[in-house]
Curated annotation (Swiss-Prot):
The formation of the proteasomal ATPase ARC-20S proteasome complex, likely via the docking of the C-termini of ARC into the intersubunit pockets in the alpha-rings, may trigger opening of the gate for substrate entry. Interconversion between the open-gate and close-gate conformations leads to a dynamic regulation of the 20S proteasome proteolysis activity. Its main location: cytoplasm. Belongs to the peptidase T1B family. It catalyses: Cleavage of peptide bonds with very broad specificity. HAMAP family: Proteasome_B_B (MF_02113_B). CDD domains: proteasome_protease_HslV (cd01906). GO terms for cellular component: cytoplasm; proteasome core complex, beta-subunit complex. This is Proteasome subunit beta. One of its GO terms (biological process) is modification-dependent protein catabolic process. Pfam families: Proteasome.
Length: 270
C-alpha cells in the first residue's frame, strides 16, 4: 500500500503543546536565528514605530506603514501589527523580514497550543512564549538583525487590557497605561503621556494612537505618517472582551481628515 500523501511519524507522535518545541526537534533550520552566518548585517528593511495604550474596555495597538533601508524608504505600505489570536495582538519593530516571520511563528505557537490543550493560553503565558521565541533570535540580534516586539491583549481573567514590552534578549516587561517601541517611540511616547487619560472609550483611544503616530512621523524620518494623497493609513487594532478588531480604513480616513483640519488651523504650532 502506498504511503504517498500520508503524514510522517513525527506528525502523528504525541508531544509537547509547544509548536516551537516541535519545530526545534524536526526542522530547526526554520527557526529564527538558526541559519545566519557570522558577519555584518546587510542593509535590510526596518519596521519603525508601534504604540499601544489601554482604555476602559481593552487595549489599542497601532503601527505606521513605513519601512526604511538606510536613508531610503523601502516600503510605504508594510504592516507591522498582527492578531496573535482572538484576544491578543503583536506589533514588530526592527528588522522587518525577521519580525514578520516571528509574528507568524507566534501565531502558529498559540494556535498549536489551543489545538493540543483544547483551551486558550493565559495572557501571561502568551507573553512568556513570545519572550522564548525572541530569545531564539539572539544570534541574529548579535549581528544587527534586531527585532523588538510589542504585545498586548485582553486578559480574560482580569477583565482588562494589558501591554508587554521586550528587549532584544527576550526580556519581558509589563507596561501600564501606554507604551511605544521603534525609532519614533521617543516622540510617540511623549504624545501618549500628554493625551492618555483613565476611562477612555475605544474611539478616544484610537484617536490618541493616531495622534501619537502623527507626532512621531513629524520628528522621525523613519516613521510614516497618515498619507491622504495615497490613502495610506496606520494599522490600528483594538482587543476587548469581544475579541480582536482592526479599525476599518474608512473610519481612519475620517479621523485623519479631522486631525489634519485641526492641525492645519493651528498652523506652525501644530
Amino acid at each position: 500500500m502506498s504511503n504517498r500523501g500520508r503524514l510522517g511519524d513525527a506528525f502523528l507522535r504525541p508531544g509537547s503543546s509547544s509548536f516551537l518545541d516541535f519545530l526545534s526537534d524536526h526542522a530547526p533550520e526554520l527557526l529564527p536565528g538558526r541559519s545566519a552566518a557570522a558577519g555584518n548585517a546587510p542593509l535590510a528593511p526596518h519596521a519603525t514605530t508601534i504604540v499601544a495604550l489601554t482604555f476602559q474596555d481593552g487595549v489599542v495597538m497601532a503601527g505606521d506603514r513605513r519601512a526604511t533601508a538606510g536613508t531610503m524608504i523601502a516600503s510605504r505600505e508594510i504592516e507591522k501589527v498582527f492578531p496573535a489570536d482572538d484576544y491578543s495582538v503583536i506589533g514588530i519593530s526592527g528588522s522587518a523580514g525577521i519580525g514578520v516571520d516571528l509574528a507568524r511563528l507566534f501565531q502558529l505557537e498559540l494556535e498549536h497550543y489551543e489545538k493540543i490543550e483544547g483551551s486558550l493560553l493565559s495572557l501571561d503565558g502568551k507573553a512568556n512564549r513570545l519572550g522564548t521565541l525572541l530569545r531564539g533570535n539572539l544570534p541574529l540580534a548579535m549581528q544587527g538583525f534586531v527585532v523588538v516586539p510589542l504585545f498586548g491583549g485582553y486578559d480574560l481573567d482580569r477583565g482588562a487590557g494589558r501591554i508587554f514590552s521586550y528587549d532584544a534578549t527576550g526580556g519581558r516587561y509589563e507596561e501600564h497605561e501606554h507604551h511605544g517601541t521603534g525609532s519614533g517611540a521617543i516622540f510617540a511616547r511623549g504624545a501618549l503621556k500628554k493625551l492618555w487619560r483613565p476611562g477612555m472609550d475605544a474611539a478616544e483611544a484610537v484617536k490618541v494612537a493616531v495622534e501619537a503616530l502623527y507626532d512621531a512621523a513629524d520628528d522621525d524620518a523613519a516613521t510614516g505618517g497618515p498619507d491622504p494623497v495615497r490613502r495610506i493609513w496606520p494599522v490600528v487594532t483594538t482587543v476587548t472582551a469581544a475579541g480582536y478588531r482592526r479599525v476599518p480604513e474608512d473610519e481612519l480616513a475620517t479621523l485623519v481628515d479631522a486631525l489634519l483640519a485641526v492641525r492645519t488651523e493651528r498652523g506652525r504650532l501644530a
